Amino acid sequence: MDLPPQLSFALYVSAFALGFPLNLLAIRGAVSHAKLRLTPSLVYTLHLGCSDLLLAITLPLKAVEALASGAWPLPLPFCPVFALAHFAPLYAGGGFLAALSAGRYLGAAFPFGYQAIRRPRYSWGVCVAIWALVLCHLGLALGLETSGSWLDNSTSSLGINIPVNGSPVCLEAWDPDSARPARLSFSILLFFLPLVITAFCYVGCLRALVRSGLSHKRKLRAAWVAGGALLTLLLCLGPYNASNVASFINPDLGGSWRKLGLITGAWSVVLNPLVTGYLGTGPGRGTICVTRTQRGTIQK
């Protein structure tokens, strides 16, 4: 399923036009709340917003690349820089969403115990670990992909591959024997594991809501808020990571579906700010999972 280059261009540009200002607003709102009281959810939201902002900045270049049918438009040394700037936030976003979901679940299932131990510095440690994991994996993969290129003067250098038609292609012409297992490991560790954590936490939040004394309307709203991270993972990041699994099983399935998955992944910069809920001046609703206990209402 190959999308027309013009449609791919329009989708990337639209994601940038919507996602860039939304993430600026989300970061601004989170910073405003952090000045009053820094919480673990705010730490995750700030990292997710900065991650999505970096991803959004790369989308115009991705749009130009799509319009040129995959040809790399910049000087060759910029390819690995673009690869890190584009794919690091694409993978890190799943980890931050899982961390947000875990905080909601712990706040709902163990309100008093979690309130006693939650500290922003622990959340900073989690965020640093997520960034380190993503960057180390991407750096290792890029290093392995380019390490032999200096000995093979025919095509490849710094992630660039020159196909037969002479057009430079950044990363997409990566040696399939190296690309398939590397992308599969990325997806298992940086998508499917966060997806399982997010799904488990979502079910836990739903169970806590069922036992709560909230009105039906507030239960529905809280359930929607808790499920936002899971929805973003499935709709935006799911297709791209599913294509990595499919291409590992059957190499003929990877190409066109991977391009479509990259487009849906780009739209995570639009949905993530809506999930975190710090776009306005009011409370960050996106970080709340509410449960009613005998002593009152606990919010995370």
From Swiss-Prot:
Please indicate the ranges of residues that lie on the Extracellular side. Answer: 1-8, 65-79, 143-178, 249-256
Explain the consequences of disrupting this gene: No visible phenotype at birth and during the following six weeks. Male mice tend to develop a slightly decreased glucose tolerance after 13 weeks of age, but this is not observed with female mice. Insulin secretion in response to glucose is unchanged in mutant mice, but it is not potentiated by fatty acids, contrary to what is observed with wild-type mice. On the other hand, wild-type and mutant mice display the same inhibition of the first phase of glucose-stimulated insulin secretion after prolonged exposure to fatty acids or exposure to a high-fat diet.
Question: Where does the UniProt entry say this protein principally localizes?
Answer: membrane
Under Gene3D superfamilies, the record lists:
Rhodopsin 7-helix transmembrane proteins
Activity regulation info: Is also activated by synthetic agonists, such as AM-8182, AM-6331 and TAK-875 (fasiglifam). AM-8182 is a full agonist, while AM-6331 and TAK-875 (fasiglifam) are partial agonists that potentiate the activity of the endogenous ligands, such as alpha-linolenic acid and gamma-linolenic acid.
A single GO cellular-component term from the record reads: plasma membrane
| Known tissue expression | Expressed in pancreatic islet beta cells (at protein level). Expressed in pancreatic islet beta cells.
What is this entry's stated membrane topology? Multi-pass membrane protein
Q: Which UniProt keywords apply?
A: Cell membrane, Disulfide bond, G-protein coupled receptor, Glycoprotein, Lipid-binding, Membrane, Receptor, Transducer, Transmembrane, Transmembrane helix
| Pfam families reported for this sequence | 7tm_1
User: What InterPro entries does its record include?
Assistant: GPCR_Rhodpsn, GPCR_Rhodpsn_7TM, GPR40-rel_orph, GPR40_recept_FA
Topology, Cytoplasmic side: 32-41, 102-121, 201-223, 280-300
Q: What does the UniProt entry say about where the protein is found?
A: Cell membrane
Task performed by this protein: G-protein coupled receptor for medium and long chain saturated and unsaturated fatty acids that plays an important role in glucose homeostasis. Fatty acid binding increases glucose-stimulated insulin secretion, and may also enhance the secretion of glucagon-like peptide 1 (GLP-1). May also play a role in bone homeostasis; receptor signaling activates pathways that inhibit osteoclast differentiation. Ligand binding leads to a conformation change that triggers signaling via G-proteins that activate phospholipase C, leading to an increase of the intracellular calcium concentration.
What this protein is called in its record is Free fatty acid receptor 1
